[in-house]
Regions:
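Juxtamembrane/disordered regions of integral membrane proteins
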Residues: 1-252
């Protein structure tokens, strides 16, 4: 049985996002951290970082943590956001991966480029570290597009295997988006941090984008297009302002 297009794309977003996230967000982050430690020089080697590790040491636990959070979780969220916003990104053609990655940097860059993270003080120069971590976002977007397209095509075969993979992808999407929304709205009852607010914004955008896509032909009308682009621009401005503020504080 052929899987509906939107369902396939949601599943493909989860699966391709995790794969690319593990490589770029997980292993890529580990590489950036290693380069940061080398660039900082011998004077900081052995100093304890904000996550409890020591500068210059590569631990199995730390690497697994990066792969799970920076790879599996962040990758799945990024892949689902791409699936949700795919119609809006299509107009950029072959540049859509780069545009998505840069947009993701604006929206969620503050999750990584956090001025409260003391590592940006310990590891110098800060400009190099900010640039390397920021570069991971467009790399993720560029790498995601071809993997996503191939995954969507593979899930369209109608076989038992493709159906099983689609089921896994949908289950991951429901789990992550559900937990993300519940956690985010629960945080609103107290004093949410900027990280919690941006995370909630990402999940709301995923849900809203998929809901808008489910409306089908209504999305093609001029009023709907203008409204949705306006909402996307507003969300991007909010996230980008927060990211830019964090970068300025790190560099100064």
């Amino acid at each position: 049985m052929r899987i509906p297009e939107l369902v396939r794309e949601v599943a493909a977003g989860s699966l391709s996002g995790i794969v690319v996230g593990i490589v770029v967000g997980g292993l890529g982050s580990r590489l950036v951290m290693r380069l940061s430690a080398i660039a900082a020089g011998s004077s900081v080697q052995g100093i304890t970082t904000s996550n409890g590790n020591r500068v210059g040491e590569i631990t199995i636990g730390g690497t697994i943590g990066l792969i799970l959070f920076g790879g599996v979780f962040a990758g799945a969220v990024g892949g689902l956001l791409y699936a949700a916003l795919r119609p809006w990104l299509a107009r950029f053609g072959r540049w859509r991966g780069l545009i998505f990655g840069l947009g993701l940097l604006g929206l969620a860059g503050s999750q990584v480029l956090d001025e409260a993270n003391s590592d940006f003080i310990i590891l110098r120069p800060p400009l190099l570290n900010v640039a390397m971590f920021a570069l991971l976002f467009p790399i993720f977007g560029i790498a995601l597009v071809p993997v996503f397209d191939r995954t969507v095509h593979a899930l369209d075969k109608g076989s038992l295997i493709s159906g099983a993979f689609a089921s896994v992808g949908i289950a991951v999407a429901i789990l992550f988006v559900g937990l993300g929304l519940v956690t985010g709205f629960t945080a609103l009852t107290s004093a949410p941090s900027s990280v919690e607010l941006i995370t909630l914004l990402l999940f709301v955008m995923i849900l809203a984008g998929l809901a808008a896509r489910a409306l089908g032909s209504r999305l093609a009308s001029a009023p709907w297009r203008l409204a949705t682009y306006g909402i996307l621009a507003a969300a991007l401005l909010v996230g980008a302002a927060n990211t830019l503020s964090g970068v300025v504080r790190i560099l100064t």
